[in-house]
Each structure stands twice: as structure tokens, then as C-alpha cells.
């Protein structure tokens, strides 16, 4: 069993303990029209191949030569984004944020102008500061004995306390906000190291955004920058997804209004590690069934997009996850199996890609087709 709190605590030691060279991902930053300072050439500046750029000619209002006004199905889509907030995910979160405006513009063009979108972001732990209070107590005892940075026993709690404090956690003072400590609850105020550290204040007044958000791209960027300071022992992306979608769960109560019977569901998750049996409970088959159950058994009303490690695949982009957890990714056979269970409505991409726009563009037609064919229950 891996211990992620040990991992992030080790990252938190930094140069002070001389255990790591740093915690930032050293890959190139994301490219594309929404990356800061992007001035690339023709294909690089759009983040799309020539063929894909033709398909996504949003300015002409067409998708693959099809006039969206001539193909009308559902006009409601619920988007759930499950975003890993562990110590190695800073660049991946930024790549997701950079690709979002183009993705939503393409969806809008494919489905039509009378759209009704809702978007919610969840991270992969119950509370970013969940293990901080115990670390504070243990580190205080180490301080009293002058052992922080000296003994092996004190290395972990002292480092974890430092990590928590880097994310503006105050020992003995910081408490979770409403629903903030519920796994699968929509993120409204990302906290911890590297997070937006801003109350997103969605116009809906809920834990999700909708298409009427005055600055939708800005609101999504606020929520999706969940940071890299999670103190939890394990990453639980599939548990977070299941809890967010399961009727009667604590998260569902927090997320009231997000999941609608008359909308299709698009789940996107992004992580650089597999979801091992010691992390999320259940199996790919169980996760599939839980998501299908959230749509009253209609699995054709669901599209699933997964960005994760591909270094176990031919021509994969990822290098092995490095010991300092700053680069690469872990192969993710369980997550891959889950996505592939959705057939043509499951799309797999590399979390190590510098630009996620081509991946999202490849899924637009699947989302549009699911919407075209959707028949709401009742």
C-alpha cells in the first residue's frame, strides 16, 4: 500500500531537509491558444491537427460538416471533472484549465445554441487538510525535543506540518468549510499548496457552475486549480466519482441540483496514478455500474473521458513516475479498464500530453451522439 501523505510530506521537506530537488513538474508547459504567452505556429497555436481543426471550426458553426441546428437531441449536459490534487499534478491541472474554453465552445457548436450545461469539479480526497491536525500534534512534540529535521521518526510529521502550513493551514485553527470535508462534494474554494485559494462564488449559488456563469472559463479555472497539497494517505478518484453521483450519499446532498434526469452525463477524470484496490473501493465493473445507476441504468446516457498514465502502452507519452513525484506517471490498468467498458463512449488520453485540446476534441462527437440519441426517463 502506498502512502501519499508520506509522499507529499517528503515533497514538503524541500531543500531544508535535502530530500528532494522540488515538487514542480518539470515538463514543458501546455501549449495551445489558451496557454499563457502562446505564439506557436499554425498547428501548435491551435493545439489541434489540421484535420481536427477543420472539424472544430466553431466560428463556422459546424462540426465535421454537420450543421448543429439540423441535428437536435438533448440540450442538457452535466459535466463532472474529477481532478487529482496530489503533489505532482500542477502542470496537469493547468493543461486542463487551458483546454477548457475550446472544449466547451466545441460542445456548444455541436449541440446547438439552446444548451443547458452544468459543470462540477471534485478532487480525490475528503479534505486537503485532513491529516494536518495529527501532524501538527506530533510535530509539536518533535519541536519540544528539538528533533524536527534530526530524527527519522520526526521527519514525516514535521514535513507534513510544513506542507500544510504552505497551504495556509494554521495548526489548531483551520477548520473545514461546509461540505469541504466530504469526498465527492463539488469544489467551491480550493485550498492547500498550489490551489487557487479563492472562493469561486458560482452564480448558481451551488457547488457547480452552469452556462449562465458570467465568466465560465474563469470560474472553471478557479475550481479546477485544486492544488498539490493533499495530506491524505491515498488518492481516491473513483470513490470521489461514485460518491458525487450516488443518490443518498453525503456528497449528493452537498451537490443537490447537479445531476439531472433529463441530461446526459460526461465524466472526465485526470490523475497520474492508477486507482489501486488500496485506494478506491470496488472494481472497474462496480464503478461502471454505479455510474450507470446514477442515470437509471441507461449507460448510453454517459460519456467517460480519462487522462492517466500510458507508459504501459505502445507509443505511450509518459515516463515512469519518478521518485520525487515531479514527472511521469504510473500505468493505470484499472482506470483504463473502466473507461474501455464504455465502448465508443469511453475515451482514453495521456495525462503526460502537453496539450489536452486534441484529446477533448476527439470526444466531442461522442458527446453529441449521446445527446442526439438520449431519451429522458419517463
Language-model segments: which ranges?
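Residue-level detector of intrinsically disordered, flexible termini
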Residues: 8, 14-15, 23, 34-35, ...
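Small/flexible residues
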Residues: 4-9, 29, 120, 193-195
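Ser/Thr-rich, Pro/Gly/Ala-heavy low-complexity intrinsically disordered linkers and tails
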Residues: 19-72
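Divalent cation-coordinating acidic motifs and surrounding scaffolds
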Residues: 24-25, 55-378
Amino acid at each position: 500500500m502506498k502512502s501519499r501523505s508520506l509522499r507529499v510530506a517528503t515533497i514538503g521537506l524541500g531543500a531544508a531537509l535535502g530530500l528532494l530537488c522540488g515538487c514542480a513538474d518539470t515538463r514543458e508547459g501546455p501549449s495551445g491558444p489558451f496557454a499563457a504567452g502562446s505564439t506557436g505556429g499554425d498547428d501548435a497555436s491551435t493545439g489541434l491537427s489540421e484535420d481536427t481543426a477543420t472539424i472544430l471550426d466553431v466560428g463556422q458553426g459546424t462540426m465535421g460538416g454537420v450543421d448543429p441546428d439540423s441535428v437536435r437531441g438533448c440540450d442538457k449536459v452535466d459535466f463532472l471533472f474529477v481532478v487529482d490534487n496530489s503533489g505532482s499534478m500542477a502542470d496537469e491541472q493547468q493543461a486542463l484549465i487551458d483546454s477548457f474554453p475550446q472544449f466547451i465552445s466545441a460542445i456548444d457548436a455541436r449541440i446547438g445554441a439552446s444548451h443547458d450545461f452544468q459543470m462540477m469539479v471534485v478532487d480525490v480526497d475528503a479534505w486537503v487538510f485532513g491529516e494536518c491536525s495529527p501532524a501538527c500534534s506530533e510535530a509539536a512534540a518533535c519541536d519540544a525535543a528539538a528533533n524536527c529535521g534530526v530524527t527519522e521518526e520526526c521527519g514525516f510529521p514535521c514535513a507534513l506540518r510544513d506542507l500544510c502550513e504552505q497551504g495556509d493551514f494554521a495548526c489548531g485553527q483551520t477548520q473545514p468549510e461546509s461540505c469541504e470535508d466530504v469526498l465527492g462534494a463539488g469544489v467551491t474554494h480550493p485550498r492547500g499548496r498550489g490551489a487557487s485559494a479563492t472562493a469561486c462564488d458560482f452564480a448558481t449559488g451551488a457547488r457547480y457552475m452552469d452556462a449562465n456563469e458570467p465568466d465560465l472559463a474563469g470560474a472553471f479555472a478557479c475550481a479546477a486549480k485544486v492544488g498539490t497539497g493533499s495530506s491524505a494517505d491515498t488518492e481516491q478518484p473513483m470513490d470521489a466519482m461514485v460518491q458525487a453521483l450516488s443518490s443518498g450519499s453525503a456528497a449528493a446532498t452537498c451537490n443537490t441540483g447537479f445531476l439531472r434526469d433529463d441530461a446526459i452525463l460526461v465524466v472526465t477524470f485526470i490523475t497520474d496514478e492508477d486507482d489501486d484496490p488500496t485506494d478506491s473501493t470496488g472494481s472497474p465493473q462496480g464503478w461502471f455500474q454505479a455510474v450507470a445507476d446514477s442515470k437509471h441504468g441507461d449507460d448510453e446516457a454517459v460519456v467517460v473521458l480519462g487522462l492517466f498514465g500510458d507508459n504501459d502502452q505502445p507509443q505511450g507519452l509518459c515516463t515512469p513516475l519518478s521518485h520525487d513525484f515531479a514527472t511521469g506517471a504510473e500505468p493505470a490498468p484499472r482506470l483504463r479498464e473502466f473507461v474501455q467498458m464504455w465502448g465508443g463512449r469511453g475515451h482514453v488520453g495521456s495525462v503526460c500530453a502537453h496539450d489536452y485540446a486534441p484529446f477533448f476534441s476527439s470526444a466531442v462527437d461522442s458527446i453529441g451522439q449521446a445527446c442526439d440519441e438520449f431519451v429522458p426517463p419517463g
